[in-house]
């Protein structure tokens, strides 16, 4: 999945949603 899938656009984390 794209980085945006993690937590909002501009997010550079993976789609695991570590935020």
Curated annotation (Swiss-Prot):
This is Putative antimicrobial peptide 2. Keywords: Antimicrobial, Fungicide, Plant defense. It comes from Lippia sidoides. GO terms for biological process: defense response to fungus; killing of cells of another organism. May possess antifungal activity against B.cinerea. The lineage of its organism: Eukaryota, Viridiplantae, Streptophyta, Embryophyta, Tracheophyta.
């Amino acid at each position: 999945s794209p980085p945006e899938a993690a937590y909002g656009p501009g997010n550079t984390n993976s789609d695991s949603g570590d935020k």
